[in-house]
Amino acid sequence: MPRDDDLRQHIAQQLSSFEPREATGDPLREAAVCVVIAHRADEPVVLMEKRAPSLRAHAGQFALPGGRIDAGETPQEAALRELHEELGIAASADAVLGRLDDFATRSGYLIRPFVVWAGDVLDEVVLNPAEVAVLHEITLPQLDAEPRFVEQRGLGEPVFQWPFEDYWIHAPTAAILHQFREVVLHGRSTRVAHFEQPKFAWK
């Protein structure tokens, strides 16, 4: 896998060949998230948060930087604003390399994911303790792990899970990361919007 400027160009090229799908149907509350690529000792990593335990919704769950889209702002503007508010990373529109598929959650949100190149910013990251408990750095070999589908009582479809360290991460976060892996690492236009979420994420 190429690194630095070559890696950035590779990711941008893979995303330019991918046609993201926008969700249709009943209107949902809109949110935007960032799949952030940064560097740790010259190794590319993707950033994933564990949400603060004090949050009213999805406390303690794994998530990508992001949040609700405010009135008057575009999804991309919202994604970059939330990235700055949660992690202190100030990224411009030029840092956005592309988009992934919209993901409609069981909790009533329509998530619009953007892929953002952050580069050498990890030493400058400042976690917002009101929103973020822990920041995880996912290496590309870790990202390239095989997921699994697990039956859950009361659901018609198996739940999608992706392995990270000692955890199993669920959709929507796992689904978005899996699609990033498929598109960027393997050049596959794998769709993930149908991946089921566990019941605890429905609230």
Where are the model-predicted features located?
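N-terminal leader/linker segments that precede catalytic domains of diphosphate-processing enzymes
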Residues: 1-63, 67-85, 89-124, 161-203
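NUDIX/MutT-family hydrolases
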Residues: 127-167, 199
